From Swiss-Prot:
<protein>
    <recommendedName>
        <fullName>Transmembrane protein 151 homolog</fullName>
    </recommendedName>
</protein>
<feature type="transmembrane region" description="Helical">
    <location>
        <begin position="73"/>
        <end position="93"/>
    </location>
</feature>
<keyword id="KW-1133">Transmembrane helix</keyword>
<feature type="transmembrane region" description="Helical">
    <location>
        <begin position="27"/>
        <end position="47"/>
    </location>
</feature>
<comment type="similarity">
    <text>Belongs to the TMEM151 family.</text>
</comment>
<keyword id="KW-0812">Transmembrane</keyword>
<keyword id="KW-0472">Membrane</keyword>
<feature type="compositionally biased region" description="Low complexity">
    <location>
        <begin position="515"/>
        <end position="535"/>
    </location>
</feature>
<dbReference type="Pfam" id="PF14857">
    <property type="entry name" value="TMEM151"/>
</dbReference>
<dbReference type="GO" id="GO:0016020">
    <property type="term" value="C:membrane"/>
</dbReference>
<feature type="transmembrane region" description="Helical">
    <location>
        <begin position="254"/>
        <end position="274"/>
    </location>
</feature>
<dbReference type="InterPro" id="IPR026767">
    <property type="entry name" value="Tmem151"/>
</dbReference>
<feature type="region of interest" description="Disordered">
    <location>
        <begin position="503"/>
        <end position="541"/>
    </location>
</feature>
Length: 541
């Protein structure tokens, strides 16, 4: 059903308007007003001739009648009607000229022309004209009181100094025609096809490339002179563009478009009804030739492929967060977000028993690594025997410390922060042993991107024979909805962006520092005041 709707939306069909739409859009008001005034003048003269015999000539010249048909007044509608008739004929000629200048072809030729428009490559061009104004003088002669007086007139003339043109080079991004298909044109005797052209971008890469070329051209030419006139547009190569076409399904046009019929109706002041009938019998088709730039970035076969344009790549942060809440997308947490998620990770095992503590495996390596390429995290359905390890390293865990850059509490609170990561720790505090050579080193940061061999909280891999399966062998994997609910705490903590979290933390830390500074300054002032009082009072013990 969706495919049928999409196919219908991508098809253009001509439609014949009803009589009310014709009157509202193309009412031909000038022709209608002239026709009505001519008819009124004709009835006025007819009434005077029938009622008072104003134009018979049998009445004596010295007898004057009073009223609208008196002598003198009876010629007003005739003169006014003749003037209106001339204006009416000029308006009819102007309307007929528009039809004559319109391109009239067969339906087959019109479809071939539209196909040529769709297959022709686009040309998006820019033109600039740099100019300045030059101050000039000239001698003019003026007359005052009949005497000729010469004067010097100062005027400014525009001088074009530089002209340049360029066009959009789309070899890298590529293009494709996405115009609609035309159907059912042969069903109507006359079809008025209105053509237009435009271009769109498939992704931000193509739009950025277009804007860079356009800005570069204008920036290079705007320094040529004082002023710059800009022109830009779109053409189609090797095809002349026509805005309107009349297409006939027969070799000869219909009778209401014949010039003899048109002038016959116009002479008898019936041009307006003929025009309304012509518009009512003519189907209208609005067709737009659309060129899409950036197809190479969407084609997997192209070297410039960057993936399809998604909705999230064009939305701002508010819409992206709303989409996350609605569709529950998951984002890999950053270092700062991990440091802020300590309590959530510690409590995730109690709130959701299906989520197990991640037990990485430390592989034997001679040096301390800064990446997690050798850290194997157990996932759903994995076993401790799935790792092809040679011999585990006996490494003594050391207590996990919070990053110095993310620590805003006192030094005594570091042990409480380390105890909050209980899900990552399996040994007791008594069993922690740190090499003596590393005890006095500064605090190290906990990073997901890199966990060294001295990282704390990861128990050693024991004998592979006593490993336990995380799930039963015959237990199927959980469905997608269950997996979403399992990761709900992580998702809830990632609603806010990292920038907002860091801003709130820095704001709170700055407030604490300000309060501490104010307290220390106040205490210093009090001490200074007390010292001054003691110095002023020598008898004070």
């Amino acid at each position: 059903m969706a495919g049928t709707v999409d196919a219908q939306e991508h098809v253009a069909k001509p439609r014949r308007p009803n009589i009310f739409r014709v009157l509202r859009r193309t009412g031909y008001g000038k022709c209608l007003v002239c026709s009505l005034l001519l008819i009124l003048c004709f009835f006025y003269a007819t009434f005077c001739h029938v009622k008072h015999e104003a134009y018979s000539g049998s009445q004596p010249l010295l007898i004057y009648q009073h009223g609208p048909c008196a002598q003198g007044y009876n010629f007003v509608p005739i003169v006014f009607g003749l003037m209106l008739y001339i204006v009416y004929l000029m308006e009819c000629w102007h309307s007929r000229t528009k039809i004559i200048n319109m391109k009239k072809v067969r339906v087959e030729d019109a479809l071939d022309y539209i196909t040529a428009l769709r297959t022709s490559p686009p040309i998006v061009w820019w033109k600039s004209v740099c100019y300045h104004y030059t101050r000039k003088t000239r001698q003019v002669t003026r007359y005052r009181n009949g005497d000729a007086v010469s004067a010097t007139q100062v005027y400014y003339e525009r001088m074009n100094s530089h002209q340049a043109g360029s066009m959009f080079i789309y070899d890298t991004c590529g293009f494709r025609d996405i115009s609609k298909s035309i159907l059912e044109v042969e069903k109507f005797h006359v079809t008025r096809i209105r053509l237009s052209r435009s271009f769109v971008f498939a992704n931000m890469q193509a739009a950025t490339e277009f804007e860079q070329q356009r800005s570069r051209f204008f920036n290079d030419n705007e320094t040529k002179d004082d002023y710059m006139e800009v022109r830009e547009g779109m053409d189609l190569s090797d095809v002349g563009f026509v805005e309107e076409i009349l297409a006939f399904n027969k070799p000869t046009p219909p009778w209401f478009l014949h010039p003899i019929v048109f002038w016959f109706f116009s002479i008898f002041v019936l041009s307006w009804p003929l025009r309304i009938y012509t518009e009512w019998r003519t189907a209208v088709l609005s067709f737009q030739v659309i060129k899409l730039f950036g197809t190479n970035y969407l084609s997997p076969n192209s070297v410039n492929y960057t993936g399809p344009l998604t909705r999230t790549s064009t939305m701002d942060t508010v819409e992206l967060e709303a989409l996350l809440r609605r569709e529950q997308h998951f984002v890999v947490p950053s270092y700062s977000e991990v440091m802020l998620m300590q309590n959530t990770i510690a409590n995730s095992n109690t709130n959701y028993p299906n989520i197990r503590c991640l037990d990485p495996v430390i592989l034997p390596r001679p040096f301390v690594s800064t990446t997690n390429e050798h850290i194997v995290l157990r996932n759903y359905g994995a076993t401790e025997t799935d790792n092809s390890l040679s011999e585990p390293i006996t490494a003594t865990p050391r207590p996990l410390r919070v990053s110095r850059s993310m620590t805003f509490a006192a030094q005594g609170n570091l042990e409480e922060s380390a105890e909050n990561l209980s899900c990552l720790e399996n040994g007791s505090r008594a069993n922690r042993a740190i090499p003596s050579s590393r005890r006095n080193l500064p605090l190290r940061s906990l990073s997901i991107g890199g966990i060294s061999a001295w990282s704390n909280g990861y128990r050693e891999i024991g004998n592979p024979d006593d490993s336990q399966l995380l799930i039963e062998p015959d237990e199927p994997p959980p469905p997608y909805e269950v997996a979403l609910r399992m990761c709900a705490p992580l998702y809830e903590r990632l609603r806010r962006s990292i920038s907002s979290r860091l801003a709130s933390i820095s704001h709170s830390s700055s407030k604490d520092l300000k309060s501490l500074t104010l307290k220390s300054s106040s205490s210093n002032n009090n001490n200074n005041n007390s010292n001054n009082n003691n110095n002023d009072d020598p008898e004070h013990p």
